[in-house]
């Protein structure tokens, strides 16, 4: 049971750190494919996702 608690805590910490790497944009979108060129142009990365109708870029 202790190991499960430690693994759960590690997962939560890693998730929080991962979220901080996201960079938000004000560019509207309907599909994630639309964000790829936006992220490349604005943040020099092609990893992007459409969330809540806004592009979100990851490094």
Curated annotation (Swiss-Prot):
It is found in: Secreted. GO terms for molecular function: ion channel inhibitor activity; potassium channel regulator activity; toxin activity. Pfam families: Toxin_2. Residues 48-55 are annotated as: Interaction with Ca(2+)-activated K(+) channels. The record marks 49 as: Basic residue of the functional dyad. Residues 1-22 form the signal peptide. PROSITE patterns: SCORP_SHORT_TOXIN. Disulfide bonds join 29-50, 35-55, 39-57. GO terms for cellular component: extracellular region. InterPro entries: Scorpion_toxin-like_sf (IPR036574), Scorpion_toxinS_K_inh (IPR001947). Expressed by the venom gland. Potent selective inhibitor of high conductance (maxi-K), different medium and small conductance calcium-activated potassium channels (KCa1.1/KCNMA1 and others), as well as a voltage-dependent potassium channel (Kv1.3/KCNA3>Kv1.2/KCNA2>Kv1.6/KCNA3>>Shaker/Sh). It blocks channel activity by a simple bimolecular inhibition process. Has a pH-specific antimicrobial activity against bacteria (B.subtilis, E.coli and S.aureus) and the fungus C.albicans. Belongs to the short scorpion toxin superfamily. Potassium channel inhibitor family. Alpha-KTx 01 subfamily. This is Potassium channel toxin alpha-KTx 1.12.
């Amino acid at each position: 049971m202790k190991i499960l608690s430690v693994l759960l805590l590690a997962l939560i910490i890693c998730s929080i750190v991962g979220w901080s790497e996201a960079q938000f944009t004000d560019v509207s979108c309907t599909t994630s494919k639309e964000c790829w060129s936006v992220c490349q142009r604005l943040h020099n990365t092609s990893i992007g996702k459409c969330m809540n109708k806004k592009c979100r870029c990851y490094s």
